[in-house]
C-alpha cells in the first residue's frame, strides 16, 4: 500500500490490515506519530519492520538508514570527481519526510560546506502538492525530468546534478540526454 503520506489513507490501511491476514508488514517510512500506538499493537499479532530513520518512540523491529551519511557519501564522490557546481534534486522536503532533508543536509554540510563550495550547490525540491496528489507510476521520474529542465535554464555553470533516489536520477538522465548533454562528460 502506498499512503503517499496521507494520514487518512494510512489510517484506513492500518485498520484494514488485520482482515487481510498478512504474513508481515514492511513500513518503508516511519509511521505517523498519531498511529505509532496502533502500529505497536498490530505488531503484537503481525510481524512489523520499519525501514527508515530511527524513531526511539516506536517499539517495533527496524532497519535504520543514516540518510545524513548517504548525503555525505554522495557529496564526497562528486568532490573527488572534481565537481564544485552541483544541483541536488529532491521530492518535497517536508516535515513528514525528514529523511529527505537529512540526506540534503548531509550532502551540504558533510562535504561541500567543508570545502567552502556550499554556495555552489543548488537544492531544487519539488512542490509539496506532489506528495498530496495520488502518485503516478512515474511521479519521481517526472520530478527528476521536470526539475532538471528548469535547472538547465536557470544555471548554466552546473557540472553535476544529483537525484535523491534512482527514479529521480533516471528522470535527470533523460532530461540531460534530451538536451544533448554527454553523460558522463559534460555533466
Please annotate each region the language model reported.
Residues 1, 28, 163-164:
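Structural motif
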Residues 8-21, 36, 42-50, 54-187:
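Bacterial carbohydrate/catabolite-sensing allosteric modules
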Amino acid at each position: 500500500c502506498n499512503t503517499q503520506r496521507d494520514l487518512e489513507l494510512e489510517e484506513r490501511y492500518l485498520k484494514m490490515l488485520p482482515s487481510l491476514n498478512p504474513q508481515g508488514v514492511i513500513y518503508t517510512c516511519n509511521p505517523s506519530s498519531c498511529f505509532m500506538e496502533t502500529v505497536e499493537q498490530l505488531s503484537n499479532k503481525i510481524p512489523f519492520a520499519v525501514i527508515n530513520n530511527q524513531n526511539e518512540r516506536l517499539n517495533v523491529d527496524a532497519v535504520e538508514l543514516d540518510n545524513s551519511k548517504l548525503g555525505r557519501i554522495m557529496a564526497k564522490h562528486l568532490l573527488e570527481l572534481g565537481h564544485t557546481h552541483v544541483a541536488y534534486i529532491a521530492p518535497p522536503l517536508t516535515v513528514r519526510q525528514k529523511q529527505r532533508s537529512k540526506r540534503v543536509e548531509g550532502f551540504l554540510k558533510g562535504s561541500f560546506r567543508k570545502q567552502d563550495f556550499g554556495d555552489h550547490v543548488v537544492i531544487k525540491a519539488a512542490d509539496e502538492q506532489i506528495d498530496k496528489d495520488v502518485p503516478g507510476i512515474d511521479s519521481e521520474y517526472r520530478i527528476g525530468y521536470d526539475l532538471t529542465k528548469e535547472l538547465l535554464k536557470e544555471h548554466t555553470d552546473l557540472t553535476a546534478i544529483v537525484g535523491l533516489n534512482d527514479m529521480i536520477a533516471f528522470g535527470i538522465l533523460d532530461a540531460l540526454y534530451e538536451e544533448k548533454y554527454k553523460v558522463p562528460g559534460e555533466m
